[in-house]
Design a protein with these regions (language model features):
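A general secondary-structure boundary signal
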Residues: 12, 140, 163, 197-199, ...
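Sequence/structural signature of beta-propeller domains
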Residues: 22-437
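Bacterial Sec-dependent N-terminal signal peptides
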Residues: 1-22
Length: 529
């Protein structure tokens, strides 16, 4: 009997270790480089393309640009069935929210994206710059209009833009603009477990305030009391919630004026606000790059402090510890089921970070999950209920990006426009690498030579040199990994007799470099150490 109990305990322990090893948060950090033309993930993870700007929707319209909040809205708390609600951060009441049906094919381990339709905001006169957002416990999505538009085109007494906007994904319906929550440059919001309390911040350099809203009824946000955070002193870790008048249209339109008069603390550009695993409120500040947190005590706040400072951090990569600058622009936040805080960055290198729950200033615990495509800002971030799949988007990547990479379905992806993907560990998403489509064969005819230097290369970056290269003329470059698969392509422009190769390999090894120019082809090898 003792052996049986010990065996059961050991079995449960081993199962726990296995589940932890399969958590999305288990990875080795990527190298902290600047942006490249592709998405660089840890070798343990992969992605699937879901949507890109210009895709055709079910009604014949095309998917709008500027994807931001990327919300997986589950059906009945399932992790394999739900909706993808995608914000489009476009100004002048021309923004939008597109909702897709999503279902996970468990046999092939890929997401099937179906029926995509835009939500009709004509009843509200449109929606302007819907940025980040939050998923309510009752399954609706609340988006933040990240702009104040003081016109009143529909003559309802409220400004046209600058509100929290609630929608329902299941039937693609606009529900309401939440007037009583006040007019501000909204980013996102998060609803507490009591189904009545909502937190958010203003993404405003001059009026970067933290707000709390207490609805009059559970699941009904149309009416309620509004509060703003007033710090007890400039360096205090305590603060007080001061009620903001919101009884009239004028009061709702002008909450910033009142907040300034009562001394609300300006954090200068608040991005996402999230509730942590132990009830603390976390929020990101864009211009400082910091992540703050506090405990809400009802009428007051305690333990207001900086959780992540904008400084240098040691990152454990496959090649050892490298120091990385955190930088400004901490933006979208989300917690996984291991209590790690995921941080998407809008600014500096636009990285995707993960902060472990045991992180402190004295003993930092920060990982770098991904580097992003040239020009892109990573946006969105939401998880399935089991936290196995992460949904996110890339806003405004450079249209000059030409590098192609394969997603888990074998689809060739170029990050040259607004793009939405799902990410997971490889054991849960897609085919094995041996099942992936193979690239075109390399022709036998070699018609010119070129030189590569440095070779070997420590980073993958190199200069190609040939007398055939002409100033201002484009050269087609393809890189093949040791398995023979294309891992990088580029249409580079010669600066004379030389062309730059900005290749970021995922692993060390010998890579084949193919160059095509005016019907001629050259081949060489690059050693990455």
């Amino acid at each position: 009997m003792i052996f049986t109990r010990c065996g059961a305990v050991l079995f449960l322990y081993l199962i726990t270790l296995l589940l932890r090893a399969q958590n999305i948060s288990v990875f080795t950090s990527v190298a902290p480089t600047t942006q490249t033309q592709g998405l660089v993930l840890p070798p343990t993870h992969d992605f699937q393309l879901l949507a890109q700007f210009g895709d055709t929707l079910a009604d014949g319209s095309t998917l709008k640009t500027s994807p931001d909040f990327t919300a997986f809205v589950p059906k009945n708390e399932r992790s394999d069935l739900g909706f993808l609600s995608l914000n489009h951060e476009i100004p002048d009441l021309q923004g939008g929210v597109t909702v897709f049906d999503l279902a996970f094919d468990k046999v092939n381990q890929i997401w099937e994206i179906g029926h995509g339709l835009p939500i009709d905001f004509s009843a509200a006169g449109g929606i302007s710059k819907p940025c980040s957002g939050g998923i309510t416990p009752w399954g609706t999505v609340i988006s933040g209009e990240e702009v104040i538009q003081t016109t009143d085109l529909d003559s309802n007494g409220y400004y046209d833009a600058g509100w929290l906007v609630e929608t329902r994904s299941s039937d693609r319906k606009f529900i309401q603009k939440i007037w009583k929550a006040g007019n501000a440059i909204h980013e996102n919001c998060v609803v507490a477990a009591d189904l009545k309390t909502v937190y958010w911040g203003a993404d405003d350099f001059s009026y970067g305030y933290i707000f709390k809203y207490q609805a009059a009824q559970k699941r009904q946000l149309a009416t309620g009391k509004l509060f703003v955070l007033v710090r007890d002193s400039p360096n205090a870790s305590t603060a007080t919630w001061v009620q903001v008048p919101n009884g009239t249209q004028a009061q709702c339109n002008n909450v910033n004026t009142f907040c300034q008069q009562v001394g609300a603390w300006n954090f200068s550009g608040i991005e996402d606000v999230e509730i942590g695993p132990y009830g603390q409120i976390y929020f990101a500040t864009k211009y400082s790059g910091r992540i703050w947190r506090f405990k809400d005590k009802g009428p007051t706040v305690s333990d207001l402090n900086i959780f992540v400072e904008n400084t240098q951090y040691p990152i454990q990569t496959a090649d050892g510890i490298q120091w990385a600058a955190w930088g400004i622009g901490a933006d979208n936040l989300a917690f996984d089921n291991a209590n790690n805080l995921w941080v998407l960055q809008d600014g500096d290198n636009n990285h995707i970070w993960m902060v472990k729950p045991t992180h402190t200033a004295a003993q930092p615990k920060i990982e770098l999950f991904a580097t992003t495509p040239f020009g892109a800002e990573p946006t969105g971030i939401s998880f399935t209920p089991n936290k196995r799949f992460m949904f996110l988007s890339f806003q405004h990547p450079s249209t000059n990006n030409t590098a192609t990479i394969y997603d888990v379905t074998g689809k060739c992806v170029v990050f040259d426009r607004g793009t939405t993907i799902v990410v997971a560990r490889k054991e849960f998403l897609g085919m094995s690498i041996n099942d992936c489509p193979k690239p075109e064969p390399i022709p036998d005819l070699i018609s010119f030579d070129f030189q590569l230097f440095p070779n070997p290369s420590a980073t993958g970056k190199a200069t190609l040199s040939s007398d055939l290269f002409q100033l201002g003329k484009s050269v087609d470059i393809a890189v093949f990994d040791p398995t023979g698969a294309i891992c990088y392509t580029s249409k580079a422009v010669s600066n004379g007799k030389q062309v730059c190769l900005d290749f970021q390999p995922k692993a060390k090894g010998t890579y084949l470099i193919r160059v095509r120019l005016d019907g001629k082809m050259g081949v060489s090898t690059l050693i990455v150490r």
